[in-house]
Amino acid sequence: MLQLHPSEIKDLVLNGGVIAYPTEAVYGLGCDPDNDTAIQKLLAVKQRPWQKGLILVASEFSQLVDYVDESQLSAEQLEFAFSKWPGPFTFVMPIKPHVSRYLCGEFDSIAVRVSAHDGVRALCQALGKPLVSTSANLAGEDPALSGDEILNAFEGKIDALVLGALGEQRQPSTIIDARSGKILRNGQ
């Protein structure tokens, strides 16, 4: 398995590669959100049903506007999300009609986060777009907390491990429904 720095992954990801990378709390698996084949590969590696949907992480909200239908959110709802970003808050927002079912699952929304993690931000900046994000584990198992765990669990199954350190968070991000304000998962 390749071990790369964030600045070295652009071509690999844009050509359909699946990567593992450190996030705020755990290692994540990611790929190009505009490549259904890559998303299907990621779902197969993780053994996750497509119906559950996935998260997109970005370095700034402007990277998410091709996926999120802002017209279905009020200025106050958007301002609330913006007040939490960048940071460990994931918001479930309405999707634009063209968004792949593999990203949003059986929902009319998608989970999005503007990350404060330097490594995640560097990945998204290198790509010039958001990155699919899901915890690096098989469905139902604990997520990986080290590069060694990634190598043991995913050798031969993913294309690269992005080098870097985990953030300071001890829990996954808090997930909030942007329309209702309801906390769907309290991560802090």
From Swiss-Prot:
SUPFAM superfamilies: YrdC/RibB (SSF55821). InterPro entries: DHBP_synth_RibB-like_a/b_dom, Sua5-like_dom, TC-AMP_synthase, TC-AMP_synthase_SUA5. One of its GO terms (biological process) is regulation of translational fidelity. Keywords: ATP-binding, Cytoplasm, Nucleotide-binding, Nucleotidyltransferase, Transferase, tRNA processing. GO terms for molecular function: ATP binding; double-stranded RNA binding; L-threonylcarbamoyladenylate synthase; tRNA binding. Belongs to the SUA5 family. TsaC subfamily. Required for the formation of a threonylcarbamoyl group on adenosine at position 37 (t(6)A37) in tRNAs that read codons beginning with adenine. Catalyzes the conversion of L-threonine, HCO(3)(-)/CO(2) and ATP to give threonylcarbamoyl-AMP (TC-AMP) as the acyladenylate intermediate, with the release of diphosphate. This is Threonylcarbamoyl-AMP synthase. It comes from Shewanella sp. (strain ANA-3). The gene is tsaC.
